[in-house]
Amino acid sequence: MPINRRQFIKRSAGAVSVGLVMPKLFLSDALAQGPINPNRRILVVIQQAGGNDGLNTVIPYTDSRYQSLRPTLAFKEADLKTAQGVSTVLGNAPFGFHPALAEMKELYDAGKVAPILGVGYPSANLSHFLSQDIYHTANIAGGAGDGWLGKYADQKLVGQSSLSAVSVGGGSLPKTFFADKVVVPNISSFANYTYQTDQRNAGDRNNQLNTFHSTNRRDFQADSFLKVIADTGVDGADGAAALQTAIAGYSSPVTYPANNPLAAGLKMTAQIATTISAANLLYVSIGGWDHHSEEIGDNQNPTNKLVGQHNTLLGYVSQGIKAFYDDMAAHGLADNLVIMTWTEFGRRPNENASHGTDHGTANVMFVVGNPVHGGKIYGEQPSLETLALDNAGNMKFTLDFRSVYATILDRWLGADSKSILGGSFENIGFLG
C-alpha cells in the first residue's frame, strides 16, 4: 500500500533503531561539545512502562487508611530506612521515599528533586496501551495524533540537527516523538547504529557506501518524495559514522551501576548529550512495573518489603538517575539539565491477594535537576477515604499531567504549551 511523506517519516524513524535509515544531520558545529552554552536546555524523559505503584514510591506512611488498605505492602516509618540505615522520610512532610530511592533522597535533600503527587487525567483509562498513548500525545480523547514532544519538534527543530531529539535504547520510537516534519532517530545500541554493509573487507565496504551514495543521488533527483527517501538513507550513512566519531570522544569519571538497564540507557544518553551539543531532547524507557503479584518479597521471605520487583526497579531508577546526573555535572551540564519521569497510571489503593496491586489512577511524577525548585512536594495526595474514592475504588487525581508538560514546555523549553497541548494548563512552581 502506498504511503505518504508523513507516514514515511514516522515509519523511517523506527527503522533507525536497526541502523538502516536516518535523517539529515550532523552539521560540523553540532558534533563538538565545545564551551558550554549557558542557554542550552536539555530535557531527558524517563518512561516507567507498566504502571508504577506511586503509593509505595512517595509513601504517605502517616495515613491510617494507607496502612489499613495495604496490611502487607504498607511501609511504616520504621521501614523507611536505606540499607545503610539512613531515613528516607521527607523532612517534616508526612511522606517518605521508598528505601530503594536512597540516591533520589540525596538529590531531594540537595533541592534537586520535585515529587509531584496526584497526577492523572479525567476519566482515566486503565488500559496500558491507551493510557500510554494519552500520556505520549497529551490527548485524553483516546491518545490519537502526534506526540507532545513531536509537536514541539515540528515547531522548534525543523531544519536543525536531527540529533536534536533522540530516543535511546528502546526497540521502537516512542509515540511521544511522533511528528509531521521531523524524523527522530531511535538508537537501540551504538554498535548497531551504522549503515549495514559487508564488514569483512574495509575496501569493499567503502565501495558499497560510495555506490549507495552515487546511485541514490543520481536516480532520485527527479522525484521530490523519493528524494526524501534517498536523502534520508544517504545522510544516514554519513550521520551514523559521524555519531560513532562523536561518542568515541566521550569519557567520564562516573561509574554507572552494572546490571541496571536504565543506567545503561542513561549512559548512552550521556554519551550523546555530552558530545553532541545539538542533542537536547532525549528519551529512555524502563519496563516491568505492572506488579499484579509479588510486588514485594522473594522465595525466602515473601513479605519482605525491602526486596522484590518494585524494590529492584526503584533502585534502577534511583541509581541510574544519580549516576547520570553526576555524569552530566562532571561535564559542566548540570545547570542545563531537567529530567522528567512518567508512567501511564498508578495502582489501586488496596493490595490484592497476591502481594501485588492492580491498575489504578492517580500517580507520582518526578522532575529532577539543578534548575528545579526541589526539596519540596508539589501537587496534593488524593484522599484514600472510602467516600473520596471513585466508583471503582480508585483515587481521584488532583493534578492534570498536562500541567507538568505545560510547565516544562513554557518554562524550560520556551515553547507555547497551549498550541502543543491543545489548551491552557496551570504552570506549577517547580521551574522558573
Placement of each model-derived feature along the sequence:
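Alpha-helical scaffolds flanking conserved acidic
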Residues: 41, 336-337
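Feature for exported/extracytoplasmic and membrane-associated proteins, marking the mature portion
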Residues: 1-331, 350, 367-368, 376-432
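Short, conserved beta-strand edge motifs with alternating hydrophobic and charged residues
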Residues: 283-285, 338-342
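Histidine-centered active-site microenvironments of extracellular/periplasmic hydrolases
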Residues: 343-376
